[in-house]
């Protein structure tokens, strides 16, 4: 007999919403129903406050930046209190030089805006189409992630001090080691007295290089969300 669940955790973009798009009413309603039975948690790649607002300020704890931000929902103020880990510094010129070499080698020399986005936490976004590319172009660039998976090993080799993920719709996310979603989930569960066998995770990016893959391969009960518009069907057994 399986262990009863106490916590259900979620990825955001591609799982509950389209990329960087507000949550739709039907998926918010599913979250509300799940919240009556389980402790809920967001485990995201992006900024915790951005995730919280993308969810329409839904009452939920939010882990951002692969665990470098811990956001706790405050029911009195209906807001998210965020504590951040100490930023991990990097040599920007060196990072940009490595990114330029990768672009030349892999054929991604045309881009709009910057090549790499440097987040305050120390997480980096290697934006193949550039930091100012149009959202429509990003969504159309690599929907099956095959272009990025083809060069994933080269990106991993170029940035050994980071965990590298096929992130978003057209980029790679680089999180300073040891930060990733598995590490973040394990730390949260330990603090809240929850065993990993009592947790489930819902995500869409569980394939090679995906930022949900580390959770999927950790043996955590995993719900594969292959279409965010069918999220409710995917988790129906939890309701």
Locations of the language-model features?
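Active-site phosphate-binding/coordination module
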Residues: 21-113
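Mg2+-dependent phosphoryl-transfer enzymes with acidic/Ser/Thr/Gly-rich catalytic loops
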Residues: 3-4, 23-24, 175-177, 181-239
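Conserved acidic, metal-coordinating active-site core of Asp-based
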Residues: 105, 110-200, 208-211
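Non-catalytic pre-domain segments flanking phosphatase-related domains
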Residues: 1-10, 26-29, 33
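Hydrophobic "anchor" residues on beta-strands that sit immediately upstream
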Residues: 7-9, 61, 200
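Asp-based phosphoryl-transfer active-site loop
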Residues: 4-21, 212
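Short, solvent-exposed loop/turn segments at secondary-structure boundaries
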Residues: 20-23, 138-140
């Amino acid at each position: 007999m399986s262990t009863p669940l106490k916590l259900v955790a979620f990825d955001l973009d591609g799982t509950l919403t389209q990329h960087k798009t507000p949550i739709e009413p039907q998926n918010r309603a599913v979250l509300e129903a799940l919240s009556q039975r389980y402790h809920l948690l967001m485990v995201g790649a992006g900024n915790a406050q951005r995730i919280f607002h993308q969810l329409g300020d839904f009452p939920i704890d939010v882990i951002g930046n692969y665990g470098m931000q811990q956001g706790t929902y405050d029911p009195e103020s209906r807001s998210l209190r965020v504590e951040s880990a100490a930023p991990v510094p990097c040599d920007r010129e060196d990072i940009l030089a490595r990114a330029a070499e990768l672009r030349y080698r892999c054929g991604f020399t045309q881009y709009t805006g910057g090549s790499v986005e440097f987040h305050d936490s120390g997480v980096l976004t290697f934006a193949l189409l550039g930091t100012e590319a149009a959202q429509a172009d990003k969504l159309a660039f690599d929907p099956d992630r095959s272009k990025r998976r083809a060069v994933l090993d080269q990106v991993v080799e170029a940035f050994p001090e980071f965990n590298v993920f096929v992130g978003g719709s057209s980029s790679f996310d680089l999180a300073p080691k040891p930060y990733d979603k598995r590490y973040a989930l394990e730390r949260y569960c330990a603090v809240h007295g929850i065993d990993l066998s009592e947790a489930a995770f819902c995500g869409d990016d569980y394939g090679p290089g995906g930022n949900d893959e580390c959770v999927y391969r950790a043996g955590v009960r995993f719900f594969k969300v292959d279409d965010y518009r069918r999220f409710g069907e995917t988790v129906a057994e939890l309701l």
